[in-house]
Amino acid sequence: MESLDRRRTGSEQEEGFGVQSRRATDLGMVPNLRRSNSSLCKSRRFLCSFSSEKQENLSSWIPENIKKKECVYFVESSKLSDAGKVVCACGYTHEQHLEVAIKPHTFQGKEWDPKKHVQEMPTDAFGDIVFTDLSQKVGKYVRVSQDTPSSVIYQLMTQHWGLDVPNLLISVTGGAKNFNMKLRLKSIFRRGLVKVAQTTGAWIITGGSHTGVMKQVGEAVRDFSLSSSCKEGEVITIGVATWGTIHNREGLIHPMGGFPAEYMLDEEGQGNLTCLDSNHSHFILVDDGTHGQYGVEIPLRTKLEKFISEQTKERGGVAIKIPIVCVVLEGGPGTLHTIYNAINNGTPCVIVEGSGRVADVIAQVATLPVSEITISLIQQKLSIFFQEMFETFTENQIVEWTKKIQDIVRRRQLLTIFREGKDGQQDVDVAILQALLKASRSQDHFGHENWDHQLKLAVAWNRVDIARSEIFTDEWQWKPADLHPMMTAALISNKPEFVRLFLENGVRLKEFVTWDTLLCLYENLEPSCLFHSKLQKVLAEEQRLAYASATPRLHMHHVAQVLRELLGDSTQLLYPRPRYTDRPRLSMTVPHIKLNVQGVSLRSLYKRSTGHVTFTIDPVRDLLIWAVIQNHRELAGIIWAQSQDCTAAALACSKILKELSKEEEDTDSSEEMLALADEFEHRAIGVFTECYRKDEERAQKLLVRVSEAWGKTTCLQLALEAKDMKFVSHGGIQAFLTKVWWGQLCVDNGLWRIILCMLAFPLLFTGFISFREKRLQALCRPARVRAFFNAPVVIFHMNILSYFAFLCLFAYVLMVDFQPSPSWCEYLIYLWLFSLVCEETRQLFYDPDGCGLMKMASLYFSDFWNKLDVGAILLFIVGLTCRLIPATLYPGRIILSLDFIMFCLRLMHIFTISKTLGPKIIIVKRMMKDVFFFLFLLAVWVVSFGVAKQAILIHNESRVDWIFRGVVYHSYLTIFGQIPTYIDGVNFSMDQCSPNGTDPYKPKCPESDWTGQAPAFPEWLTVTLLCLYLLFANILLLNLLIAMFNYTFQEVQEHTDQIWKFQRHDLIEEYHGRPPAPPPLILLSHLQLLIKRIVLKIPAKRHKQLKNKLEKNEETALLSWELYLKENYLQNQQYQQKQRPEQKIQDISEKVDTMVDLLDMDQVKRSGSTEQRLASLEEQVTQVTRALHWIVTTLKDSGFGSGAGALTLAPQRAFDEPDAELSIRRKVEEPGDGYHVSARHLLYPNARIMRFPVPNEKVPWAAEFLIYDPPFYTAEKDVALTDPVGDTAEPLSKISYNVVDGPTDRRSFHGVYVVEYGFPLNPMGRTGLRGRGSLSWFGPNHTLQPVVTRWKRNQGGAICRKSVRKMLEVLVMKLPRSEHWALPGGSREPGEMLPRKLKRVLRQEFWVAFETLLMQGTEVYKGYVDDPRNTDNAWIETVAVSIHFQDQNDMELKRLEENLHTHDPKELTRDLKLSTEWQVVDRRIPLYANHKTILQKVASLFGAHF
């Protein structure tokens, strides 16, 4: 079988014959798998060959589920192949058939029937396809039968080929032959097509061949692949081609699968066949068992596209049905047919103007009214755009083209013309999205589902510009709850502009943010997010502690634990642990919000669980944290702009980002975090600056206000934790710190006054010191003394004096009075040190915020000066212990002497308060780090030179101390100029050394001669080594160290002011909390504190000035004031942004572009106005000419004048319109063009009958239409009372028209109609079909449409209004399988008053009452109905009666509702069950078109909204 297949396919190229012209109906579609250059992206799943296991699965699955078609009976055809061989009717030769197909000659002469002679067999062509001589491009291919179910092909593509479900189908159709496009237009098309496919995750479906529009698409994908990287995305291009038309297809036949199959692209030898395009990624090759027959793939492709478009795809957290759009380039008759079918199926089409032929014809007439699209106009356009084949067009074809183009243009909502350079359509991707939105907006839906669908598309594709201009308009008022699902989707997919848009359109975060929403957001963090990994660690730790097998579910207290690590332990948990962690909540492990596009309310799918508190304390804070931890810059900025406690929020975000940046491994992400942290710090500075300018006192309150939302911390504490030096160095904050530093003293007091009062405190009573509060000036002496000595500045200086006294006493004891038995001075030092120990202990255990001992210890030892204090105290204790033991007295004194150095170093902390010396401490710290790393470099040279020198000079030195001296110590001193005297041999002396190294106080002598008086080592070598060592160590390395110091100094010096201002806070805070008495008198304060805490159990008081808990009302007022000033800050920022030169240039450019567009539009309007005026003038001249012609003719007939000299006043016009056509053109076009439209649809409903095309101008019977030859169709109906079936007038001879014919009323509301050859003629004109069609009677078929309405009322009973007008509700019904509703009416039985359908939904006992209501109703319409079932000889006429219930308590209304039922029990055996509902009257109600017109008249009758 395999060899036969190969032989058969091998001769297909030579034996092809009679190839039909290809139908250019190639639709296209692009997937969104990430793709780049194949040589760089070998790991891509569809470019890599399947693994052996996958190949085996595919080799077994495809033959079982996918078939091919083979001709099993050879029936000789009358035609020969191109090589002159006999072929079968299928197009293949004898050799290309199976053995069972070769039958005796008895089968010859019989007609070949594909239904009998073609059978399905397991396919033998599938696998990977490799195009030879074209690098290493690899695709997928499969040969399928034309009857293969679409679901099987879809399963193959998504499950076995591994394609992601598309977000969009782009069906590209157009010219099947090569055509030329402008370079710019070609570039725009290629770029836009690939862009929309790559960014939206679309599939592009084309015909797959290497010609025409398919080649254009392939080249677009190729260009993208060559210029992109693996990360930029992959474009999936699927070619659906006919197997029997593929050149060189024999190489694709592999019964067990080709992995890979090589395919040669041979354009020169393809003949009438076609080659596959090498730039397509997947091929579906449709087989019907024939050879050389084009268009076989069209039905399967149409079904496949329809099947895929009915699937649901989730994108950006939103589930929508996969939309489809048709993109048209160039094309011929087949393309026109494809566009026509797409428009009729509701598929939006994008026509690329400038691509040629059909596309340009449609683009040229798309803006014209349908009445102006005439046969002559289309003929003129065809002569321009189809110059080569215009002569082959017949009159029937031109009429058909005119009719189809009229129907296409009539549905403008589905037609989008892409014009190069058109405003708002700079690229094809914008045109495609606009086409989908325009089509969606035109659909009929109840309520907001239609707008919701449009918004889903815009969010899924991240096109906020179109959403702003096309969706959020005055046509629909969005409710905030309707936007909540979209808001969640925008947040998860990081689309900040949509978040801003939703906030602008009414979304309130307090209503949007719930516990379930937050959990949804946190559960859907990106796995690469650092916060996500931290959460996983917390959950794993909880699982470990609980000895649980499964990972616990995420709760907000887990998030709070991670946040506390980032914010610092000065904050409390933002989300406390709930009492019941297993409370009911939504399971949101997947970020998708299930939203069905077709008529399901968003609100019904976005309900929160009830029974517990759902809303958070501060929703803006919660969203802000979520955005910040993911480093979403724009999103965080938008949410911060909504925050109330904005200064604290900005500082907290700065802290979180800086902490995350320390752990982030990705350098780029870390830098972005730091940049965003700086941005938030600047925002905090900006808001605080506005507040401080407005009111200094209230601004300073903001600094120390306890923020409940941010863990009961303060703005100042957050800034310090985040090390926001710029914020802390702000003038307002420094003024506040200065105020705290001076306590209740005036800042104007000089330091010398403070010191004098400390030395002579009675000066306090003389007014020598001034206080901030005037009341202290007049208070009694104790209050003034207390205020003075409690000021931090006084406490600081008193402690300085005390510390200097301690150091002096310590030095005195060490140098003068260090006795075997301690003196009173030494005992005083012990007491002094004990007071220092007590103070350090107090600082360690002081925990007013309840952080815990371990955390307080961690915070305590995080300070360098505290470490130094502890080290000095411990060293003192060690020295004291040794000192008290007589045997270790001297070592004890040494230890205490070293300890004195540490106590002296502690003095540097005092310099922090100095603006000059404070930054220098930082410089010293950083230089010490520089020295530490520098020593590693220096050690290399020191050790290398020292070892070499020691080895050259000294032989076998065994004393370790002298080795160390020779290698390290002497080498180190050499750097500073202490060069050994003997190294050059000049000052060599044996007296200064020990020959054998026996003298412990002398070094061993260098190598000497046998006399021992002269050196034996090479002096030149040691001198050379010394010079090199000094060059590198003394010059190079020391200068490097100096340069490092200089860099450190310059770096710190640039930020001296900020560093000093930041440092002084720690000192101020320390002395603000210290007891007022200095050591050792501080022991009294410690004793008092001990009694309060231990004995009296009095808790520690907070520092009121550094942490202030405000009353609720005061806090609310303060935050409102801050919010107001934040708005001022944001406005100033926007103004400054607009004043930037770059922004001004951009604004000017946009204004110039707008002005140019307006001028162009004005020119077009003027040109159009001129053309209209000329046409009007031409028509007036024609009328005058005809009038004069009539006058002349009348005068001549009356005997006035002779006919010989009469002038011809009616000249032959170029268009030569008859009078009837002139009257047609005078008609004003209405929405229905003035003619019946539905009655002229080419395909008759529920039948495979095609109407004869009837353009608008040929509708009236008076218009001459010589080629009019409509088919005849009369359906057989199972109703007894119907007219007979027949295409002749004989069976109808007994029918009497224009009268009441027995029980049938054949009179028309439009008067007497014409009866021609026994058939009545439709009074509205031609329809393109003769006969009765599916109607019951020839002539008029009368129907009744009751329009039952009532006012729409709210829960309170008041009438609802929209745009000032009252709103109506109408009673409608529909079949379960129908998408549209209808009025409860229809045809009536002869002699009956109520329609049949109305009787089925109304109980029989109410029929008489309803007839009474009909007689009392108001007739709103009576006449012809434009129905698709109408024909030339049968049509529908209706009477519409309005039945309105003004009062909701109307007894007849209640009876009507009681007697309505969903279906008639007698009709249970039928599939015609009707349902009824009350629906709001609106122009978008999904109602049949003719019924909607009636409903509009009823709304106008009552002045209601429509």
Swiss-Prot record:
What's one GO MF term for it?
intracellularly gated calcium channel activity
Q: Which residues lie on this side of the membrane: Cytoplasmic?
A: 1-750, 768-792, 846-864, 915-926, 1042-1076, 1096-1506
Which residue ranges does the record annotate as region Disordered? 1-22
The reply on keyword Transmembrane helix is: yes
Q: Which reaction does it catalyse?
A: Ca(2+)(in) = Ca(2+)(out); Na(+)(in) = Na(+)(out)
Q: Where is the composition biased (Basic and acidic residues)?
A: 1-11
Q: Which residues lie on this side of the membrane: Extracellular?
A: 814-824, 886-893, 948-967, 983-1019
Superkingdom in the source lineage: Eukaryota
Domain Nudix hydrolase as annotated: residue spans: 1350-1501
Q: Which residues carry this modification: Phosphothreonine?
A: T738
Tissues expressed in: Detected in the preoptic area of the hypothalamus, a brain area involved in body temperature control. Detected in beta-cells in pancreas islets (at protein level). Detected in brain cortex, striatum, hippocampus CA1, CA2 and CA3 layers, and in the Purkinje cell layer in cerebellum. Widely expressed, with highest levels in lung, spleen, eye and brain. Detected in dendritic cells and in polymorphonuclear neutrophils.
- Motif range for Nudix box? 1386-1407
Which Gene3D superfamilies does the entry link to?
Answer: 3.40.50.450, Nucleoside Triphosphate Pyrophosphohydrolase
- Membrane-topology descriptor: Multi-pass membrane protein
Q: What's its job? A: Nonselective, voltage-independent cation channel that mediates Na(+) and Ca(2+) influx, leading to increased cytoplasmic Ca(2+) levels. Functions as a ligand-gated ion channel, gated by intracellular adenosine diphosphate ribose (ADP-ribose), Ca(2+), warm temperature, and oxidative stress. The precise physiological activators are under debate; the true, physiological activators may be ADP-ribose and ADP-ribose-2'-phosphate. Binding of ADP-ribose to the cytoplasmic Nudix domain causes a conformation change; the channel is primed but still requires Ca(2+) binding to trigger channel opening.
Q: What protein family does this chain belong to? A: Belongs to the transient receptor (TC 1.A.4) family. LTrpC subfamily. TRPM2 sub-subfamily.
Record protein name field: Transient receptor potential cation channel subfamily M member 2
Q: Which organism is it from?
A: Mus musculus (Mouse)
